[in-house]
């Protein structure tokens, strides 16, 4: 098998991808705007697994804590900006924030910055993260089949994340 000597992607490509569909999640809050899933499927009662988001690309921010300090806000802002940068393709992309601990709390003063954001909590022992939860903290791209395929470092360059995502959107026949 031929492997190119130079990779084009900025994020860490996960091989093999990690399935993200089968574990149980608990919905904390859902977007009121800027979500194609909400706009087209208002009949969804409660999301208890990522099966509901199947067929969508997802920019996911995964964290171990339930508070949103500056680093958290920066990463959530990154997911928002990257989604908006996709232009007409933004309705193919959802945003989510998942925590392993407690309920996520978004201060009322920050609500506008979090439009279009799904928030969930999950038990680390039921997820693919049970090996090393700290590794999974960060920004990820989840493909339309519900697999973690690319991870980004904290403080990632939004333009480079966008470039990776736009390549995936262009090449994808699903989602």
Mark where each language-model region is.
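Extracytoplasmic
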Residues: 54-56, 90-92, 134
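Short active-site neighborhood of thiol/selenol oxidoreductases, capturing the structured segment around
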Residues: 46-80
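Short, internal strand/loop/helix patches
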Residues: 94-142
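Short, surface-exposed patches at the edges or C-terminal ends of soluble domains, predominantly
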Residues: 2, 80-85, 126, 163-175
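Thiol-/selenol-based redox modules, centered on thioredoxin-like
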Residues: 135, 141-175
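N-terminal "domain-start" segment that seeds a small globular fold
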Residues: 1-51, 74
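Residue-level signal for short, function-critical loop segments
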Residues: 63-65, 101, 145
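Structural microenvironment flanking redox-active thiols in thiol-disulfide oxidoreductases
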Residues: 68-112
């Amino acid at each position: 098998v031929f492997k190119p000597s130079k990779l084009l992607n900025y994020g860490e490509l996960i091989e093999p991808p990690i399935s993200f569909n089968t574990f149980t999640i608990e919905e904390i809050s859902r977007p009121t705007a800027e979500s194609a899933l909400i706009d087209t499927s208002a009949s969804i009662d409660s999301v208890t697994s990522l099966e509901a988001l199947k067929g969508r690309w997802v920019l996911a921010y995964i964290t171990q804590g339930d508070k949103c300090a500056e680093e958290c806000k920066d990463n959530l802002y990154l997911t928002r900006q990257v989604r908006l940068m996709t232009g007409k393709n933004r309705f193919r992309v959802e945003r989510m924030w998942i925590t392993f601990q407690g309920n996520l709390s978004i201060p009322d003063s920050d609500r506008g910055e979090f439009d279009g954001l799904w928030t969930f909590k999950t038990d680390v022992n039921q997820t693919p993260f049970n090996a090393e939860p700290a590794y999974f903290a960060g920004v990820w791209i989840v493909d339309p089949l519900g697999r973690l395929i690319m991870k980004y470092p904290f403080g990632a360059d939004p333009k480079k994340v966008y470039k990776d995502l736009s390549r995936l959107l262009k090449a994808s026949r699903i989602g």
